Amino acid sequence: FSKLDDSTFVFEGKTALKDFYKAIKLDDPKLFEEHKGESETMAGFLLEITRGFPKKGEVIKFHKYTFTVEGFENKRINQIKLYINK
């Protein structure tokens, strides 16, 4: 992943949720765990919370987190930008 500033990150879609939690220093992943369904990756999580397939450039708001689908490869989300609202 890349950290652009204190609130903005770029992740690969295949990033494991547990690695995502560590990267953003999330102490309690309960909020994400309650909504992740069967997903284990960031891309899978976005599919779960949108209940569909987001388009490139689509913005998905989840509590104080804003995800933007930045890229696809072979119909898979491969890049996600995250902004954490303070």
Regions found by a protein language model. Name each.
Residues F1-K86:
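Cytosolic regulatory modules rich in charged/polar residues
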